[in-house]
């Protein structure tokens, strides 16, 4: 299968490319390196050093014997997207190329607008390129469980069968996202569903939970194949952040009561889910939705798990919640679709957390401690960037 990965230089895009390549698929990458630019803007860098994309691709060719063409450009340039899709002629497009941080989108007006422009316009350009070139191309799009919010009912996988005043229908599950980033993902989902309905496109929307981890089977093969590890208050996911705080001897900072419950997933399972979705494509005209996570935990449960696993003393500190969200709520989400396709989950365990501790210990001199604390407050319309250059 010919697979085009949008955002192929990113935290998830790069290990996904390796995972698909080693399993016999022809893979090409698209990126504009804006994620690396955001490191400069924020004054913080990946905990684990990451090579340039040129060096990564060259190393992969040496290690595996497999080449991966690279296209450099911005998905907001619709003509360029058309050109890339025509040139590579993929069977599947995996779309990671979006600004992925809720706090970043809530910094101020400029960052909110940039997030929505990048994410929504870029995805629209991809949809138009598929419709113009080959409507059989399968779009595998990374969404987020954050689209749903925390409703007081069970969350279904994308669609809801309902009966209202004696009539029945099937509708998209109601969305109540908690940031301008999450809203951009909702807009994407609606746009993709509409494109499937009017153009007969085939798409799989993967509403992913909070990702943790840094290593996959393929990234371990050479240091130049490593993917990034973000721990800061803007891009760092909660488990990655807690492991850094534990290693540094800092309290694990839980926002508010800590009852915020989310689906979580190991990065090893993320790449597995993408492959399973790509190898079992949606049918023409289908907007298929899977909830992509393997277990659900509250923030406090995650903190307690990390604290119990760390060999030293680790305290848990409750801090004022910078976000506007429910801190104690019902949460139960369906996630059987990917299991039915063959997903074998890697659940959170002491062994896995120990591996994160080792990564953090190995690179702790690269940590900027001031970048860990939250500085973006949802109720403010202008936030300062701590540590920015």
Regions found by a protein language model. Name each.
Residues 6, 117-120, 181-182, 232-236, ...:
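Short, solvent-exposed loop/helix junctions and linker helices
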Residues 187-191, 195, 242, 302, ...:
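Hydrophobic alpha-helix immediately C-terminal to the catalytic Tyr-X-X-X-Lys motif of short-chain
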Residues 246-389:
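C-terminal substrate-binding subdomain of Rossmann-fold SDR/epimerase-dehydratase oxidoreductases
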Residues 1-214, 378-380, 388:
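N-terminal Rossmann-like NAD(P)+-binding domain of SDR-like oxidoreductases, especially those catalyzing
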């Amino acid at each position: 299968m010919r697979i085009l990965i949008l955002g192929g230089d990113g935290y998830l895009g790069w290990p996904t490319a390796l995972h698909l390549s080693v399993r016999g698929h022809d893979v090409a990458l698209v990126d504009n390196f804006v994620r690396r630019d955001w490191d400069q803007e924020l004054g913080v860098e990946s905990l684990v050093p990451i090579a340039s994309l040129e060096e990564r691709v060259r190393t992969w060719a040496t290690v595996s014997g497999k080449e991966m063409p690279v296209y450099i450009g911005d998905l907001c340039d619709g003509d360029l997207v058309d050109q890339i899709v025509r040139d590579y002629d993929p069977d599947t497009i995996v779309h990671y190329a979006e600004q992925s941080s809720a706090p970043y989108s809530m910094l101020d007006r400029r960052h909110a607008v940039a997030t929505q422009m990048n994410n929504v316009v870029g995805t629209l350009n991809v949809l138009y390129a598929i419709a113009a070139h080959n409507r059989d191309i399968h779009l595998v799009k990374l969404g987020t469980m954050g689209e749903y919010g925390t409703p007081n009912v069970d969350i279904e996988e994308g669609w809801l069968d309902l009966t209202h005043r004696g009539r029945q229908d099937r509708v998209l599950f109601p969305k109540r996202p908690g940031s301008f980033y999450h809203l951009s993902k909702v807009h994407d989902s609606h746009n993709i569903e509409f494109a499937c309905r009017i153009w007969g496109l085939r798409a799989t929307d993967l509403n992913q939970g909070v990702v943790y981890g840094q290593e996959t089977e393929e990234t371990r093969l050479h240091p130049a194949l490593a993917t990034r590890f973000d721990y800061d208050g803007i891009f760092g996911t909660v488990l990655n952040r807690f492991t850094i705080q534990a290693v540094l001897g800092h309290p694990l900072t839980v926002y508010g009561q800590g009852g915020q419950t989310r689906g979580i997933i190991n990065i090893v399972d993320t790449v597995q889910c993408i492959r399973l979705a790509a190898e079992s494509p949606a049918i023409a005209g289908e907007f298929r939705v899977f909830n992509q996570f393997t277990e659900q935990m509250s923030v406090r449960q995650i903190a307690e798990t990390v604290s119990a696993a760390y060999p030293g003393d680790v305290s848990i500190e409750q801090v004022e919640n910078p976000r506007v969200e429910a801190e104690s709520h019902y949460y139960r989400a369906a996630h059987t679709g990917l299991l039915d396709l063959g997903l074998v989950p890697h659940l959170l365990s002491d062994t896995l957390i120990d591996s994160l501790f080792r990564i953090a210990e190995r690179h702790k001199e690269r940590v900027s401690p001031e970048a860990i604390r939250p500085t973006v407050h949802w109720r403010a319309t202008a936030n300062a960037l701590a540590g920015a250059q």
